[in-house]
């Protein structure tokens, strides 16, 4: 496999890739930054990073990988997780997080220096006081993190 390179993407381009390839999530409405992973001029993955979805984790120093999606090409997930962490660190953030389904191995995260931080029960953001339609899996998830700098 040739070397993986990054390219800038517009939100529309990233969302189109997610809509075509992501196994269980829809595209996002906004993000802080995003990039594409390219091999031989072909887009093989996208990574989108935003403020943490959970307001309890949104401390101003943490970012979340909200979408990482590939076409199945080898090593692209690890490449994207590593690149997202480097970019977040360069921007001055101290921590980056992401969630995976508890049925996923996390091998790409472990390979790129991330560690398990917590396990969630899963569930939906829907509440009687604030109705939401849930399209994502509501199964338990594992939160991984990578410390980028000591505070």
Language-model segments: residues:
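Short amphipathic alpha-helix that is part of the acyltransferase structural core
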Residues: 1-28
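Acyl-donor binding region in acyl/amide transferases
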Residues: 8, 32, 50-140
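Conserved beta-hairpin
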Residues: 18, 32-47
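Short, conserved, surface-exposed binding loops centered on an aromatic residue
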Residues: 27-28, 37, 56
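Charged phosphate-binding loop/patch that engages nucleotide di/tri-phosphates or the phosphate backbone
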Residues: 140-151
